Structure formats: structure tokens, C-alpha cells
């Protein structure tokens, strides 16, 4: 969205059909527009911060992170969601559900933003269990375990919404269904 104007929306069904994370698709498409308009593309972190309306806090964590997928994909998480290894999520033993973290791989300085939706890990000394997609963004999928530093993020603006406000132009009159709307 630009102001109150909807530029595009990604249906959850489309991202599933493409086998791609909806956040990454939204960022790629937004960056295609930005490049066409001779504007710097956004990094993954910049896009996620804008998409979720987040800002950094002073609370930091560090430790060892692993990732989980395969066997758990499609199973129930501790907060009642169905686990999707392609989402930007993380398990933590005590952080409140829906807490956002900016996690940085200390070996290569790559970062990703994840949302707490599960409990774990339960193997010492690990303190985070990342989704497969989050691990890929940190280049930790093959190593399996990585030292990290994380910053707790807090909301500073409205999050993306599943139902956009009613269209104000005739060309949007046929917009239907549940949409994933990006506002960055």
C-alpha cells in the first residue's frame, strides 16, 4: 500500500501454489516496482519491518539456534497454528507467542525476522528453533546449528491485514477473497 492505496495483494493460495513464502514474494514484487521507478530495493529486514510495522526494542537475546521442518510440517504448534516450515516462525521456551525477533547469524551477519509460534527447543544448549525458511535466510540450513544474536521487536504501526479496506476505485471493484496485503 502507498498511503491508503492498494498496489497489489498476494493470495495465500497463490503463494502455496508457487511454493514460495508470501512475504518473500511481496518483497520481490515490491522491489521490482522500486527498481522500475529507479528507487533502491528493500532488504529482507527493511521489508519485514515495514510489512509488520515493527521497531527495535532494547531487549536482546543470544545463544545457539537450530531449525526444524520435515517431520513437524503440517503438525499443530504450541499456539494452535499448523506449523509451516516455509513461514518466518521460531520456537522459544518462554517468549510470549506472536513476539517478533530479528535474528542474526553471528558467523555471517545475515538476519531475518521471525514470529514466535511454538515452544522449544528442548536440546541444550539450543535456545531457538527456526523454521526451514528462516534457517535458509540465515544460511544455517546445512550447518543445522548456529550462534545467534536476537533483538525483540515491537509494533509501531498497524500490521498487514487479511482484509483490505473497501476499494475506492472502479478498477478494484472485483477484488474478492482473503488477501495478504503488504503495506511497504
Predicted features and spans:
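A general structural-boundary detector
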Residues: 52, 67, 121-122
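Short, basic/aromatic beta-hairpin or loop at an interaction surface
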Residues: 61-83
Amino acid at each position: 500500500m502507498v498511503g491508503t492505496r492498494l498496489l497489489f495483494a498476494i493470495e495465500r493460495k497463490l503463494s502455496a501454489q508457487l511454493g514460495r513464502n508470501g512475504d518473500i514474494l511481496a518483497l520481490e514484487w515490491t522491489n521490482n516496482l522500486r527498481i522500475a521507478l529507479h528507487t533502491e530495493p528493500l532488504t529482507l529486514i527493511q521489508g519485514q519491518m515495514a510489512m509488520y510495522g515493527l521497531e527495535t526494542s532494547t531487549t536482546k537475546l543470544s545463544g545457539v539456534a537450530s531449525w526444524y521442518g520435515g517431520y513437524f510440517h503440517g503438525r499443530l504448534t504450541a499456539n494452535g497454528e499448523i506449523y509451516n516450515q516455509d513461514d518466518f516462525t521460531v520456537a522459544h521456551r518462554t517468549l510470549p507467542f506472536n513476539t517478533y525477533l530479528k535474528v542474526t547469524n553471528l558467523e555471517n551477519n545475515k538476519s531475518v525476522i521471525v514470529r514466535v509460534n511454538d515452544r522449544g527447543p528442548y536440546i541444550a544448549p539450543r535456545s531457538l528453533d527456526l523454521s526451514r525458511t528462516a534457517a535458509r535466510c540465515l544460511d544455517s540450513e546445512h550447518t543445522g546449528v548456529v550462534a545467534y544474536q536476537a533483538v525483540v521487536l515491537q509494533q509501531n504501526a498497524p500490521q498487514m491485514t487479511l482484509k483490505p479496506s473497501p476499494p475506492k476505485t472502479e478498477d478494484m471493484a472485483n477484488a474478492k477473497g482473503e488477501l495478504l496485503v503488504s503495506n511497504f
